Regions:
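Conserved GNAT acetyl-CoA-binding A-motif
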Residues: 95, 102-114
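Conserved beta-strand-loop-alpha-helix junction that forms the acyl-donor binding cleft
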Residues: 111-121, 140-143
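Short hydrophobic/aromatic beta-strand or adjacent loop that forms the aromatic wall/cage
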Residues: 42-43, 134-138
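Acetyl-CoA-dependent GNAT
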Residues: 4-72, 77, 95-96
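Conserved acetyl-CoA-binding loop-helix of GNAT-fold acetyltransferases
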Residues: 81, 87-100, 123, 127
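Conserved acetyl-CoA-binding loop of GNAT-fold acetyltransferases
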Residues: 126-135
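Hydrophobic adenine-recognition pocket in adenosine-nucleotide-binding enzymes
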Residues: 5, 79-81, 114, 130
Length: 143
């Protein structure tokens, strides 16, 4: 079942991020970010909960993508589903929920970046209707 992410999801989010994406971020920092981003209309956070156990099995996090060279859309920052439940339609459901929100807001697209080595993710995105339109490198400056 799709629903908004909640404060009680922090442990599950941390576990999913570690197991699926390889990111370690403390529960305290995750809770702080979740509280802040949940109140920001430029961020959209949607979870998928098991209807029987009420355990969070996956989530999508998107931000508004606006520029001087395109109409507004969503940029997916994270789509993560617990490894034990992948292949059951959870990721597809989360993206359908994101599609609905993008259309409700009048956005023209949803975009995402996916690491070069994540071939399984690439196949999934293509299966659910996304196309690869660019190959690029990411540059970052850390303070």
């Amino acid at each position: 079942m799709l629903r908004d992410l909640q404060e009680t999801d922090v442990k599950a989010i941390c576990d999913i991020n570690q197991e699926t994406l390889g990111y370690t971020f403390s529960p305290e920092d995750t809770a702080s970010q979740l509280a802040r981003l949940s109140q920001d209309s430029h961020h959209f956070l949607l979870g998928y909960e098991d209807v029987t156990s009420h355990v969070l099995l996956g989530y999508v996090h998107a931000e508004v993508y606006e520029s001087l060279y395109s109409k507004a859309g969503f940029n997916i920052l994270a789509l993560a589903v617990s490894p034990q439940t992948q292949g059951q339609g959870i990721g597809k459901s989360l993206l359908q929920g994101l599609d609905q929100e993008a259309k409700r807001r009048g956005y023209g697209f949803i975009r995402l970046n996916s690491a070069d080595h994540r071939l399984g993710a690439h196949a999934f995105y293509e299966k659910v209707g996304y196309t690869c339109d660019k190959v690029q490198k990411r540059f970052i400056r850390i303070f």
